[in-house]
A protein has these predicted regions:
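Formylglycine-dependent sulfatase
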Residues: 2, 9, 14-19, 23-438, ...
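C-terminal helical cap and adjacent loop that interface with cofactors, partners, or active-site loops
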Residues: 443
Length: 508
């Protein structure tokens, strides 16, 4: 009896010590802040040397940590890309969450679910997961967390910019946090998503704009790109205010900071396209626990890698469903854990309501090393959407639809001036049907203007990339690669306008 009592006392003391250590560790668990802009391509940060975009706060995060120069989003469209980030799975692995404007079934585990279950306070401001209907998926809140969108600006700084006061909402979230409670927060800016102000700019300002090679170098293009840059700056300003809040709270050094974008710029042949400017996004990460500053990583990384990184940084076990590689070792100085030859993947299904019977334009992409391979398994469909739709029972005028391109000054110029010899080249780049397979050296041709799929000198390499992408799609259960692509067409569109189009044989 005496021995039992001593052992019990010893066990109790040891247990108390363990609980004390556990509580101390719990108080030191890292916070997580993810800042994600809406439709923002990789070249357009001042850290990348852009002459017309200013992002001092994104740059500061990179300077205090890492800049990943070849980061790829999960999709060239909002909701599937965000779903890939949240679930740690490629968009083709997550059913209706992998298409645009559908649902997000509760049985797909997100890192937010894991963090909340482990005691993290979770929230978001601005745009979380969407567009789509998360209630239809059986969820009780947006997959990005608890919504904080009550605080509004008295006046938006510019037409087209949201009145949501992102920084004030983050302040409210922090004020509600219990002392010592670890937190995760998703700052989802609505910028630089269209629509824009379409106002004039001084000539000297427009002269700074760098027009990509897939857009016409016109005043309309320059005006729109300058509007785009000002909206990126708004995103960056609120990021800066959030960093100030973290510093004032003494939490900056204990917070994993991730700054990125959901997909590329909202221009023709970028957003909603499997080319580099549709999926290649900015990425800056700060992790003070690693002690590394100002590191530039050239190896391609994907959104599924970020998902695994968040989970491991929080001290949790990465679920088997999360297929990415955690970059935590990289953030702690082991850069070599990312192999130079590792592939990253992206893809898309339906974007907007743009075709007969709401059909999609599926694409799958793989970036490895210097090359990007693109598979478009329905090459007879128009990549930007059907040229004409049906309004009040009548066909709209020729070339008046193409709804997979967001409405903008550039789009209207392409459509109305398509007969112009100069403008017409860019019109056809944006809307013409494309080959089933394309292959680009994105190191030399980041605008994806020179398809190497038919080049004899690249035939062996192209076959290798094509085979690797196909094998990956089959092994991860992509319905398109398994010959059951109709699955994607059957997912309902639950958010966004529904339009009507002529049958394929009459659509041109």
């Amino acid at each position: 009896m005496q021995t039992f009592t001593r052992r019990s006392t010893l066990l109790a003391l040891l247990l108390a010590q363990c609980l004390s250590v556990s509580a101390g560790d719990d108080a030191k668990r890292p916070n997580i802040l993810i800042a994600i802009s809406d439709d923002h391509s990789w070249p357009h940060t001042s850290a990348q040397g852009s002459g017309f975009v200013e992002t001092p706060n994104l740059d500061a995060v990179a300077s205090a940590g890492f800049r990943f120069d070849n980061a790829y989003s999960g999709s060239p469209g909002c909701s599937p890309s965000r779903a890939a980030l949240l679930t740690g799975q490629h968009h083709w692995m997550i059913g209706p969450a992998g298409t645009h404007g559908s649902s997000f079934p509760v049985y797909y585990t997100t890192f937010v679910d894991l963090l909340e279950k482990d005691g993290y306070k979770v929230g978001f401001t601005g745009k979380g997961w969407g567009p789509g209907d998360w209630l239809a998926g059986g969820r009780t809140k947006n997959p990005a967390g608890v919504e904080y969108n009550e605080k509004k600006l008295e006046q938006a700084p510019r037409v087209g910019i949201s009145k949501t006061d992102y920084a004030a909402n983050f302040r409210q979230f922090m004020d509600e946090r219990r002392e010592g409670e670890p937190f995760y927060f998703w700052y989802g800016a609505h910028e630089p998503h269209l629509k824009y102000a379409e106002e004039g700019h001084p000539e000297e300002v427009l002269a700074k704009v760098e027009v990509p090679g897939f857009l016409p170098d016109t005043e309309a293009s320059r005006r729109m790109l300058m509007d785009y840059s000002l909206e990126i700056n708004h995103f960056d300003n609120h990021l800066g205010m959030m960093l100030d809040i973290l510093e004032a709270e003494g939490e900056l050094e204990n917070t994993l900071l991730i700054v990125t974008a959901d997909n590329g710029m909202p221009m023709p042949r970028a957003k909603a396209n499997g080319y580099d400017n549709g999926i290649h996004v900015p990425l800056a990460v700060r992790w003070d626990k690693g002690g590394i500053k100002g590191q530039v990583v050239d190896t391609p990384v994907g959104f599924v890698d970020l998902s695994a990184t968040v989970v491991e940084a929080a001290g949790l076990e990465i679920p088997e469903s999360f297929i990415g590689q955690s970059m935590l070792p990289v953030l702690e100085g082991n850069i070599d854990t990312l192999e130079d030859t590792r592939p990253v993947f992206s893809g898309r299904e339906r974007h907007s309501s743009s075709r007969y019977q709401n059909l999609s334009y599926p694409q799958r992409m793989m970036r490895r090393g210097d090359y990007l391979v693109v598979w478009s398994p329905e090459p007879n469909r128009f990549p930007a959407g059907t040229p004409r739709n049906i309004v009040d029972g009548e066909l709209s005028p020729p070339h008046s639809a193409y709804f997979d391109i967001d409405d903008s000054e550039i789009k209207r110029e392409l459509l109305t001036k398509r007969e112009d010899p100069y403008i017409g080249k860019f019109f056809h780049l944006a809307v013409d049907k494309r080959p089933e397979w394309q292959f680009f050296n994105v190191r030399e041709d980041p605008e994806c203007l020179h398809d190497l799929a038919g080049d004899p000198e690249h035939a062996q390499l192209f076959a290798e990339y094509r085979g690797q992408l196909t094998q990956t799609l089959v092994s991860t259960g992509d319905p398109r690669a398994l010959g059951i692509g109709q699955v994607w067409e059957d997912y309902p569109r639950l958010r966004g306008p529904m339009r009507y189009f002529p049958a394929p044989e009459t659509e041109e």
